[in-house]
Each structure stands twice: as structure tokens, then as C-alpha cells.
Amino acid sequence: MPIGVPRVRFQYRRDRSRVWIDIYNRLYRERCLFLAHVVESQIANQLVGLFIYLGVQDETKDIFLFINSPGGGIISGFAIYDTMQFVRPDIQTICVGLAASMGSFLLVGGAITKRLAFPHARVMIHQPMSAFFETQTVEAILEAEELLKLRESLAKVYVQRTGKPDWVIAEDMERDVFLSATEAQSYGIVDVVGVALASKG
């Protein structure tokens, strides 16, 4: 049985009364955003709006994007990525479970030196799949050309942000490549692997 979204008490500034709001709403106010779904247009629009709002609200404080996503649409992923580069605050990206496909692309898109993976996180990169349209023959050719352009754009970002040679990225994108947190750090997708807190007592 689903437990629903937990609610927590919150007090607005200049208001003594407290209200109950869902935990994600509360965390958004602390500049903590979550990508815990397939990347698609609705999720992309929500994140784009939140990035812009938080960027305007305070240009000096970092924004935290927690990622646990199997990936999703290329265009939606680029919309999120481009907004991350557009806003003034640094975006700290944190992989808390799985960052696959467009999830790993957004993970690598965080501010350099501020990309983190939890110790048991997994990262997967691969080339974009054909998922634009139900195609006929001519449309399939046009789609293949568009996918090739998008693949080149993805590869260019990975090269710039990991420091890997373009031939390494091109070769690894030919198949599903799964990486542990430490392997993702060595690859240049993340900068830091989070460590567990020391046990109490």
C-alpha cells in the first residue's frame, strides 16, 4: 500500500502560524530539487521553472539536483541541461541511486567539482535511441539524421565535461556502459563519491 507523500510543518516568514506542506515542497524552498522519474516534457518543464525561479530568487546560493532516474527523452533532457547552464547559481548534481541515459547526462552537467555520487549509486551511458515518432520509410531516414546530430551533441558535452577523448566517448556510447560510483568518478562524470557517516557510538 503506497504511503503517499509525507507532509511536514512549515512556517512562512512574517507569519506566526504554521501550515502542513508536502516534503518536496519544503525541500524546494531549501533549493533541493529531485529528478526521480523518467525524463519527459512535464518533468522537464517543472525543473526548468524551478531552476529559473530559484536562480532569480538568489543568484549566490547553489541549487541541488538529486538524481535517481532511468533516463528518458533527449529533447526534454537537453531542455533541463541547457537551463542548468543558463541560470547563475551553480547546480550541484547528486546521484542517489541510478543515473542512466539522460540521467547520467544531467549528472555530468552539474557544476564542475560539484558533481557527487553516493557510494552505491550506478551510472549508465549509451547512445540515444530512436523514440521520436512512429515512422514510415522516408521519416525514418530523417529521424536517423536527427538522432545522429543529437548523438554528436551528447558526445560533445561528455567530452567537454569529463575530459575524455572523443573517440573514447564515441566507443562507449555504442553500448550500455554501467559504472559504479568510483568508476564514474574516474571517468569524470562525477567529482566526488559520498562517504557514509561514521557509525554512532
UniProtKB/Swiss-Prot annotation:
UniProt keyword list: Hydrolase, Plastid, Protease, Serine protease
SUPFAM superfamilies noted in UniProt: ClpP/crotonase
PROSITE patterns, alphabetized: CLP_PROTEASE_HIS (PS00382), CLP_PROTEASE_SER (PS00381)
Top class in the EC scheme: hydrolase
Gene Ontology terms for molecular function: ATP-dependent peptidase activity; ATPase binding; serine-type endopeptidase activity
UniProt keyword Plastid, yes or no: yes
Main location: plastid
EC number(s) given by UniProt: 3.4.21.92
Listed HAMAP family: ClpP
Family designation: Belongs to the peptidase S14 family.
Quaternary structure annotation from Swiss-Prot or TrEMBL: Component of the plastid Clp protease core complex.
Protein name listed in UniProt: ATP-dependent Clp protease proteolytic subunit
Species for this entry: Cuscuta reflexa
